[in-house]
Regions:
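Nucleotide-activated donor-binding/catalytic signature segment of Leloir-type glycosyltransferases, i.e.
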Residues: 60-85
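Aromatic "clamp/platform" in nucleotide-sugar-dependent glycosyltransferases that forms part
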Residues: 106
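Short acidic/histidine- and often glycine-rich active-site loop of Leloir-type glycosyltransferases
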Residues: 59, 128-139, 143-144
């Protein structure tokens, strides 16, 4: 399923696909992601940024200056800025193709995107101490990193060099972070 989704998106099936979905605004800690990706550009991966926002042009400039995008040979690009996606089917395909979801935001208090990724067996790496980190058990259903470029890059390197831990965390994320509407309805009825 993952390989088929990668093929549909013209992404190499033999390299990890890293994903960020959300507003392209500084509050989401997107600069940290780009700078951390530059520190691990010697590793095989491709990062996909889905969304739009006031910081998108600056993000693209930073990525180009760091040699991550805008190369004359697009196959050397490590980052693609995909833009906004309105189609649920396309978004599902993107999450399915992804191997690791990047979400170091300390701005969000209960992001749905981490659970969306988990529902399609994509674990997340989040900032330790953020509200999102409260639902992540490091190495079990996702990954934690300090809110620092070097720490995030080191954590990415550790994860990317050990693809089997991504598989374990993907299974854990799907088992522990995903809840059906029926489960939620029962919980609401029990409380009220």
């Amino acid at each position: 399923m993952k390989w088929a989704a990668k093929n549909e998106l013209y992404v190499a099936v033999d390299e990890p696909l890293l994903l960020f979905v959300g507003q392209h605004i500084w509050e989401k800690n997107v600069k940290l992601i780009i700078e951390a990706l530059a520190k691990v550009k010697d590793l095989p991966y491709h990062a996909l940024f889905v969304g739009d926002g006031y910081a998108r042009a600056d993000m693209q400039t930073i990525a180009a200056k760091l040699g991550l995008s805008g190369n004359s040979d697009y196959r050397k690009d490590k980052i693609t800025f995909f833009g906004s996606v309105q189609s649920r089917e396309l978004m599902q395909m993107i999450y399915t193709a992804a191997d690791l979801f990047l979400f170091p935001s300390i701005y969000d208090n209960a992001p749905l995107v981490v659970r969306e990724a988990a529902s399609l067996f994509t674990p997340s790496i989040v900032a330790r101490g953020s509200n999102t980190a409260e639902i992540i058990q490091d190495g079990i259903n996702g990954f934690l990193s300090d809110n620092d470029v070097t720490a995030f890059a080191n954590r990415l390197r550790y994860i990317l060099e050990r693809p089997t831990i991504i598989s374990w965390a993907a299974k854990g994320a799907a088992e522990t972070l995903v809840r059906s509407w029926e489960d939620i309805a029962v919980e609401v009825l029990d409380r009220y």
